[in-house]
Amino acid sequence: MSNFFAGLADVLTSEPAYIGAAAVAALLAFGACGEWIAERSGAINISVEAMMLAGAFGATMGYHLTERFTVGAVFGVGAGMLVGVCQAELSHRLTADQFVVGLSLNILILGLAGYLEDVIKPDTKRAATVDIPLLSDIPLIGEALFGQAWLFYLIYPLVPLCWWLVYRTGWGLEIRAVGGSPQSADVSGIDVNRRRRQSIYAVGATSGLGGAYLSLALVGSFEDDIVGGRGFIAMAAVVFGGWTLRGSIAGCVLFGTVLSFRLSLPVLGYEINNELLTALPAAAPIIGMAVFAHRVRAPAALAQPFIRGLR
């Protein structure tokens, strides 16, 4: 245990640890931004994992075909949205169970992406980092926040864009209305299921972009287990943050730091029990939600399907 805390002290003063924490936090934030919008609409989408995996594979294929990272990113967003369309149409048009659909998509995309990767064997490489002058020279955190691959920087405009959409547009007002009282929203003329479908399309887009960031910027290749449960951790960040965007991003930073901490300790030469390190990323969301769950309120209609005429 003394090794653990000594390692923690070293990690907190290690610039590479901050770089890793920021990179993983950004990955989680890509998924959490869209998931936050969906859950504010009352939709529960557990296929974030599948969307990220599809985005990672789509981005790899896009780069494989064109050797352009921008095209890869577009392919990633498209692949993530395709999974989002499946989730949205099955759950909020055909009224299939949201949890069953999400779980099925996670399993389907995992198998499909693995099969296609074995058959096609797409070739890619890791995008170069782009240092922002002066800002990247800030001690300890400069490289972490301003010395990453260009895909990383997309999270900076994405977060305020999502906030603006939900709180400063008529569409966002309707999203919040259908998440709070879908019956009242329906009476006022809002198409509840249409708004929920649109919110899930948004999750597909942001999670697909996150998958592209993972395969093109963080890893530089594709494997069928590349996401490794981070889609579920992004969902946990939304709950941890009390269904607020600010809280969700804070959760992403916390969980991303824990995930990075697991990888940083061995690199710094500390021999920590491998099972303990493996459990850390899963334990952090559970502990966080247990501590803060009583302080937050979920959208009133979260996970409740809407069928016109039924209460």
Regions found by a protein language model. Give the residues of each.
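Helix-loop-helix "hairpin" substructures at the membrane interface of multi-pass membrane proteins
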Residues: 144-222, 245-250
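Cytosolic-side transmembrane-helix boundaries in multi-pass membrane proteins
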Residues: 162, 180, 186-194, 265-311
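Extracellular/periplasmic helix-loop junction at the C-terminal end of a transmembrane helix
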Residues: 110-141, 262-270, 294-303
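Inter-helical junctions in multi-pass inner-membrane proteins, predominant
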Residues: 13-18, 166, 203-236, 267-272
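Glycine-rich helix-loop "coupling/hinge" segments at transmembrane-helix boundaries
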Residues: 49-50, 161, 217-246, 251, ...
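Loop-to-transmembrane alpha-helix initiation sites
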Residues: 98-100, 125-131, 148-153, 196, ...
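Short loop segments and helix-boundary regions at transmembrane helix junctions
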Residues: 37-44, 83-136, 168, 226-246
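Single transmembrane alpha-helix segments in multi-pass membrane proteins
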Residues: 16-69, 73, 78, 82-99, ...
